[in-house]
Amino acid sequence: MAGFCREDILMEDNDILVVHKHAGMAVQNARMGQMDLEHALLNYLAKQARAETPGQARTQIPYLAVVHRLDQPVEGVLVFAKNKDAAGKLGRQVKDGTMKKEYLAVCEGKIEKQGVQKFEDFLVKDGRSNTSRVVQPGTAGAVSYTHLRAHETLMNL
């Protein structure tokens, strides 16, 4: 599993961190003895604060809010908030759908239809195992939409 390094920070200002998350790294709550991205970034911010104020004792934990997540096996880009104001604004963007998320995947098989295809599923989250599963429509599941468009067709993979 790849860990976190300084080069994984794609953009940083006073309000946000935009970070490349490697496949295999948990965003939060990694198993005991494993580093997750949230704590790696907290360590980075604490080290940065110590470097900016040498000789001063730093006991305050830096503020960092997870704005959205990616599953542990998924590689991608995440946005973290560095203060409460940014966390509130970014959280509203996630909630009202103005923050756009895109996923790219390599799939096996043939896509029959051209253009954008829309899939509707119903998901139930299991908090104990931190997993979600697809359930039948009309059950307790929350609706989830996936829009799929083939960008490229590769032969003989």
Go through each PLM region and give its residues:
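RNA pseudouridine synthases
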Residues: 1-149
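Single conserved hydrophobic/aromatic residue that forms the stacking wall/gate
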Residues: 147, 152-157
